[in-house]
Amino acid sequence: MAETIKIKLVKSKIGTLPKQRQNLEALGLKKIGQVVEQKDNPQIRGMIDKVSHLVQVIE
């Protein structure tokens, strides 16, 4: 596995559940098209799984 992973927000968080919005905030994603770099670990992967319909993983 790589040390870091890039995550891009591709869909709006409007209409999502509060837990999903909290996951996006924890990942550091606020605006559509924003790309953040996070450590590649099981915790981050779990957050990505919860909002997989809103984000795109760039490896």
Swiss-Prot record:
> Which of UniProt's keywords are assigned here?
Ribonucleoprotein, Ribosomal protein
Q: Which GO terms describe its biological process?
A: translation
Q: What does UniProt give as GO cellular component?
A: cytosolic large ribosomal subunit
Q: Which InterPro entries match?
A: Ribo_uL30_ferredoxin-like_sf, Ribosomal_uL30_bac-type, Ribosomal_uL30_ferredoxin-like
Question: Where do the coiled-coil regions begin and end?
Answer: none
Q: Which Pfam families match?
A: Ribosomal_L30
The answer to whether UniProt assigns keyword Ribonucleoprotein to this entry is yes
Q: Which NCBIfam families match?
A: rpmD_bact
Summary of subunit composition and partner proteins:
Part of the 50S ribosomal subunit.
Q: Which family does it belong to?
A: Belongs to the universal ribosomal protein uL30 family.
Give the protein name, as stated in the record.
Answer: Large ribosomal subunit protein uL30
* Species for this entry: Alkaliphilus metalliredigens (strain QYMF)
Gene encoding this chain?
Answer: rpmD
